[in-house]
């Protein structure tokens, strides 16, 4: 079987990671002790992708949990599925990274990284044919962003031909923990551009807006945001965990989704959107799902896809439904909105259907888009970065850990290059100039 080793780093990474394991364990019929109580062969057919089978028929997640302080990992361990993880796979320091990327990447994190790699190596060795790694982390803090990107580059060094996939939570002023988030995020993106094969941008701004506007939650908690993240992560990994044809492994997904190596930042979406504890039981139709899934309001990245064009799209439908109807609806979307799909990649929308719906829903749809509109997210971070960096605000926290200002300048220009590359492919051979007036102004800015 083609196995995936999962890593989670930092507070955010461990919280969404723990939630991910709760959701997929439930979908595969695995209880908190690792025992199987399922009702369908489909649940076990590809169980080896994410789980090791241990003695006594117990299933153990191929997960490595990393943090620079013990707090979050203690709560994961005492949480609902805390006992399912292999105890040796908790690797933590005591000092904390204090939301400082340099501490995670160069000082504190660098001291812990070798013990993490030992655990990763052990997990990789127990694999029959490792396809790659996935990391859950945030880009705003110190550990997930600094040490997370350090782990990525170390794993890249040791396993250069394996796919590296990240679920990266992008900071937002609306849900902010620290003032230095733009620094940490920019330094991280600088690493992700070079060292990952696919990155799902999960944007706190979008999650917050969904909770607030769509789900009508007046004060969204991290629990509410994480509920959305886990639904999305469960959706985008469906093809990897259940038998099927399309995008059945990380490499095939990358081949379908990434036309240019640097442009691998995906915008995930999910339909129907439900709040925690109130899954609606109203029956959805395939046309409704399709329409919702392409709607800007359902995107987990705060970018409007109508401001850009899709290079590629993958859609995953879950539940019992007619394949024919799904194909018709997907074609319908493309024909009606053809100007939003680049014409120089024909057949750039791929669809998969899985019979098993997520818990509490009859059917659902997950969207993975590689859209040039994702540049809005990088622009947003870049503007915040520049505002502080111009005044060298808070810089001493980073230089004190041995960083150089030059590194900030490089990261800033790499992220700005990324924005220009997205813009370049958005404008490529576009006859219909009308829609791209915004585009030209940004080029000159």
UniProtKB/Swiss-Prot annotation:
Cofactor: Mg(2+)
Annotated positions of the 5-glutamyl polyglutamate modification: 438
Acidic residues bias: start-end ranges: 429-445
Superkingdom assignment: Eukaryota
Pfam families found in the cross-reference section: Tubulin, Tubulin_C
Molecular-function GO terms, alphabetical: GTP binding; GTPase activity; metal ion binding; structural constituent of cytoskeleton
UniProt motif (MREI motif) ranges: 1-4
Tissue spec. comment: Preferential expression in germ cells.
UniProt: GTP binding residues: 11, 69, 138, 142-144, 204, 226
Post-translational modification note: Some glutamate residues at the C-terminus are polyglycylated, resulting in polyglycine chains on the gamma-carboxyl group. Glycylation is mainly limited to tubulin incorporated into axonemes (cilia and flagella) whereas glutamylation is prevalent in neuronal cells, centrioles, axonemes, and the mitotic spindle. Both modifications can coexist on the same protein on adjacent residues, and lowering polyglycylation levels increases polyglutamylation, and reciprocally. The precise function of polyglycylation is still unclear.
SUPFAM superfamilies registered for this protein in UniProt: Tubulin C-terminal domain-like (SSF55307), Tubulin nucleotide-binding domain-like (SSF52490)
Annotated binding of Mg(2+), by residue: 69
GO terms, biological process: microtubule cytoskeleton organization; mitotic cell cycle
A single cellular component GO annotation: microtubule
Function: Tubulin is the major constituent of microtubules, a cylinder consisting of laterally associated linear protofilaments composed of alpha- and beta-tubulin heterodimers. Microtubules grow by the addition of GTP-tubulin dimers to the microtubule end, where a stabilizing cap forms. Below the cap, tubulin dimers are in GDP-bound state, owing to GTPase activity of alpha-tubulin.
Subunit description: Dimer of alpha and beta chains. A typical microtubule is a hollow water-filled tube with an outer diameter of 25 nm and an inner diameter of 15 nM. Alpha-beta heterodimers associate head-to-tail to form protofilaments running lengthwise along the microtubule wall with the beta-tubulin subunit facing the microtubule plus end conferring a structural polarity. Microtubules usually have 13 protofilaments but different protofilament numbers can be found in some organisms and specialized cells.
Family indicated by similarity: Belongs to the tubulin family.
Name of this chain's protein: Tubulin beta-4 chain
Native species: Xenopus laevis
């Amino acid at each position: 079987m083609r196995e995936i080793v999962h890593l989670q780093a930092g507070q955010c990474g461990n919280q969404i990671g723990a939630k991910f394991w709760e959701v997929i364990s439930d979908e595969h019929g695995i209880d908190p002790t690792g025992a199987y109580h399922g009702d369908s062969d489909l649940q076990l057919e590809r169980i080896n992708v994410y789980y090791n089978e241990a003695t006594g028929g117990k299933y153990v997640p191929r997960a490595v949990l990393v943090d620079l302080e013990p707090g979050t990992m203690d709560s994961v361990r005492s949480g609902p599925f805390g006992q399912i993880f292999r105890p040796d796979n908790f690797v933590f320091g005591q000092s904390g990274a204090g939301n400082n990327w340099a501490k995670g990447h160069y000082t504190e994190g660098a001291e812990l990284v070798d013990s993490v790699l030992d655990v990763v190596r052990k997990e990789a060795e127990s694999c029959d044919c490792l396809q790659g790694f996935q990391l859950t982390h945030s880009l705003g803090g110190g550990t997930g962003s600094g040490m997370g990107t350090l782990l990525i580059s170390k794993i890249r060094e040791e396993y250069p031909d394996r796919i590296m996939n990240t679920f990266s939570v992008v900071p937002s002023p609306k849900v902010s923990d620290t003032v230095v988030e733009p620094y940490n995020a920019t330094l991280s993106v600088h690493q992700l551009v070079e060292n990952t094969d696919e990155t799902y941008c999960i944007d706190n701004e979008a999650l917050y807006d969904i909770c607030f506007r769509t789900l009508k939650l007046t004060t969204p908690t991290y629990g509410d945001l994480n509920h959305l993240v886990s639904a999305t992560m469960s959706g985008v990994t469906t093809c990897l965990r259940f038998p099927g044809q399309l995008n059945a492994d990380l490499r095939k997904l990358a081949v379908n989704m990434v036309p240019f190596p640097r442009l691998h930042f995906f915008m995930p979406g999910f339909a129907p959107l439900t709040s925690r504890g109130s899954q609606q039981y109203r029956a959805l139709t395939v046309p409704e799902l399709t329409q919702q899934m392409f709607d800007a309001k359902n995107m987990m990245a705060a970018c409007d896809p109508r401001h850009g064009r899709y290079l590629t799209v993958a859609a995953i439908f879950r539940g019992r439904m007619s394949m024919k109807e799904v194909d018709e609806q997907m074609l319908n979307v493309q024909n009606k909105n053809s100007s939003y799909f680049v014409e120089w990649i024909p057949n750039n929308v791929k669809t998969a259907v899985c019979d098993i719906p997520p818990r509490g829903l009859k059917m659902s749809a997950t969207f993975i888009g590689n859209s040039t509109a994702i540049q809005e997210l990088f622009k947003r971070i870049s503007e915040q970065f520049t505002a502080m960096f111009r005044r060298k605000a808070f810089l001493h926290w980073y230089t004190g850990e041995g960083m150089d200002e030059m590194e900030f300048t490089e990261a800033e220009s790499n992220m700005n290059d990324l924005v220009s590359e997205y813009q370049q492919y958005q404008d490529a051979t576009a006859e219909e100039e009308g829609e791209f007036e915004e585009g030209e102004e940004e080029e000159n800015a």
